[in-house]
């Protein structure tokens, strides 16, 4: 009788351990697959994650997700108008940060590159056209001012 009880305890313990092990393995496999896809997307867009790009351009990530959803639906006109206003705000922030950090205004090329890559990442997420570099007014040279 005692050997039957010990046998049941061992079998039940083995079953519980096996189920826990398989669940942990499945979770680890899905987490690894998800990290590979996010890393490949980040490497495609200059090494930036989407949340990092949103922080650089000071964009609310939930608003960006809403824009992505609306661009995928394209049903209601007011939603499209709202999405376009969010895109216009993002573009305005980009052009401001890009021009402020230009080398002609004693800005940082590194920061300018970060801003450009952040916008490139957001446009890639929204599947928009490639990003053209904004034109920056070059300061007049001293020779031209003397004339």
From Swiss-Prot:
Q: Does the keyword Signal apply?
A: no
Q: What are the recorded Gene Ontology BP terms?
A: protein import into mitochondrial matrix
Q: Give the chief site where it resides.
A: mitochondrion
Where do the record's region annotations for J-like lie? Answer: 52-127
Where does it localize? Mitochondrion inner membrane
Q: How does it sit in the membrane?
A: Peripheral membrane protein
PANTHER family, sorted: MITOCHONDRIA ASSOCIATED GRANULOCYTE MACROPHAGE CSF SIGNALING MOLECULE (PTHR12388), MITOCHONDRIAL IMPORT INNER MEMBRANE TRANSLOCASE SUBUNIT TIM16 (PTHR12388:SF0)
Question: What is the documented function of this protein?
Answer: Essential component of the PAM complex, a complex required for the translocation of transit peptide-containing proteins from the inner membrane into the mitochondrial matrix in an ATP-dependent manner. In the complex, it is required to regulate activity of mtHSP70 (SSC1) via its interaction with PAM18/TIM14. May act by positioning PAM18/TIM14 in juxtaposition to mtHSP70 at the translocon to maximize ATPase stimulation.
Domain comment text? The J-like region, although related to the J domain does not stimulate ATPase activity of mtHSP70. It nevertheless mediates the heterodimerization with the J domain of PAM18 and is therefore essential for PAM complex function.
How is the quaternary structure described?
Heterodimer with PAM18. Component of the PAM complex, at least composed of mtHsp70, MGE1, TIM44, PAM16, PAM17 and PAM18.
Indicate the family of this protein. Belongs to the TIM16/PAM16 family.
The protein depicted here goes by the name Mitochondrial import inner membrane translocase subunit TIM16
């Amino acid at each position: 009788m005692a050997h039957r009880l010990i046998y049941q305890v061992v079998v039940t313990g083995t079953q519980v351990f096996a189920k826990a092990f398989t669940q942990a393995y499945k979770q680890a496999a899905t987490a690894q697959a998800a990290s590979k896809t996010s890393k490949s997307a980040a490497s495609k867009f200059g090494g930036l994650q989407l949340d990092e790009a949103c922080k650089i351009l000071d964009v609310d990530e939930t608003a960006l997700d809403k824009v992505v959803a609306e661009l995928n639906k394209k049903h209601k006109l007011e939603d499209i108008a709202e999405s376009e206003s969010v895109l216009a705000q993002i573009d305005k922030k980009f052009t401001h940060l890009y021009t402020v950090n230009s080398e002609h205004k004693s800005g940082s090329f590194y920061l300018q590159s970060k801003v450009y890559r952040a916008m490139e990442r957001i446009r890639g997420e929204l599947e928009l056209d490639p990003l053209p570099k904004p034109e920056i007014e070059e300061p007049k040279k001293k020779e031209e001012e003397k004339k």
